[in-house]
Amino acid sequence: MRNIIYFILSLLFSVTSYALETINIEHGRADPTPIAVNKFDADNSAADVLGHDMVKVISNDLKLSGLFRPISAASFIEEKTGIEYKPLFAAWRQINASLLVNGEVKKLESGKFKVSFILWDTLLEKQLAGEMLEVPKNLWRRAAHKIADKIYEKITGDAGYFDTKIVYVSESSSLPKIKRIALMDYDGANNKYLTNGKSLVLTPRFARSADKIFYVSYATKRRVLVYEKDLKTGKESVVGDFPGISFAPRFSPDGRKAVMSIAKNGSTHIYEIDLATKQLHKLTDGFGINTSPSYSPDGKKIVYNSDRNGVPQLYIMNSDGSDVQRISFGGGSYAAPSWSPRGDYIAFTKITKGDGGKTFNIGIMKACPQDDENSERIITSGYLVESPCWSPNGRVIMFAKGWPSSAKAPGKNKIFAIDLTGHNEREIMTPADASDPEWSGVLN
């Protein structure tokens, strides 16, 4: 693995079978597994502070997943810490901890820290996983996310998603409104702004490597630019001047091409751009609005929405524009489809009308239309819920949620996450209003 912030020095412990059943994240809601994340042993005060902070992040990651219930340290009976001893399992079972995490932090002469952990099954009294990481002090939070990812993967069978980033549009509450592209950790930490707010910006998108983003900027009312920004160097460049574009491009899995929608002559169509040559290729035909394209994980298909039949619905086509198939058949208008990284589901926004007016919904449906035309499932609804995007393991959806103004409070927009089962909806804290989230892949 190249360009990683830490390297694995050794695999400390063998993986054994364990008593806990693997958590199935796709089929309904199960009670969270109780887990004790013990105090990390430390060899000096700096390591002790780092270990304390890492335990908090690991516990928070596991709690936010909705699949684990971290037990308060005030309940712990055994006082020993570290990885050099075998736990007193009866003491952990007494407080109903099915899983136990022990760890230690040591400061190295280089100034880096060596972090080790073990995951124990207290029922079978077996160690499940263990690893040693070397990490610079300023990247301790990423190391904590990596450990939480390992625990999540061992217990669920799916890769974790904690060591990831979110790019989004931040909007000030003051007038005039200032919109800026912002970047943060998946849990809302380490928020920073990437643009200065001098021009309107929309729909940031990660490149495949997650070290670059693309976004739309309205330089003037008539000039719309797509920018590429390198997150490592901070350098920006103009990808193209695309009059009529409304969303930033989405990228092919190989990173060589991107798709976007552009309005021309009264119609909006899907175009694919070769990022090396900057050549555009039109993929859709006819009249109407075709927009919000998203590649399948293998790059062979594209999902998008179109009002060619009068009401916006979802369609799938081959990446060359052939073999168009409609996949949505429910009542209402569909928008913003996003293909799961696993390839099994497509998330979407759906707008329905009732006696109380419009309702916005986030839903998922099977990606293969021949499977079941009635496979659609709504997982959350509200006054304004939109812009769904997937965690890199395809098990969590992040989206924007809005509330109207009232006599008691102004309107607001925030970012939320929810499991694909429709459970565990939670807000991702941002310093200001937020919209248009995009989730990176797991960082290297």
UniProtKB/Swiss-Prot annotation:
SUPFAM superfamilies xref list: TolB, N-terminal domain, Tricorn protease N-terminal domain
GO BP annotations, alphabetical order: cell division; protein import
Transmembrane segments: none
Keywords: Cell cycle, Cell division, Periplasm, Signal
Keyword Cell cycle carried by entry: yes
A GO CC term attached to the entry: periplasmic space
Signal peptide residue numbers: 1-19
Protein location: Periplasm
One Pfam family this sequence matches: TolB_N
Highest taxon, organism lineage: Bacteria
Description of how the protein assembles with itself and partners: The Tol-Pal system is composed of five core proteins: the inner membrane proteins TolA, TolQ and TolR, the periplasmic protein TolB and the outer membrane protein Pal. They form a network linking the inner and outer membranes and the peptidoglycan layer.
Family per similarity comment: Belongs to the TolB family.
Function per UniProt: Part of the Tol-Pal system, which plays a role in outer membrane invagination during cell division and is important for maintaining outer membrane integrity.
Protein name: Tol-Pal system protein TolB
Organism from which the protein derives: Rickettsia conorii (strain ATCC VR-613 / Malish 7)
Gene: tolB
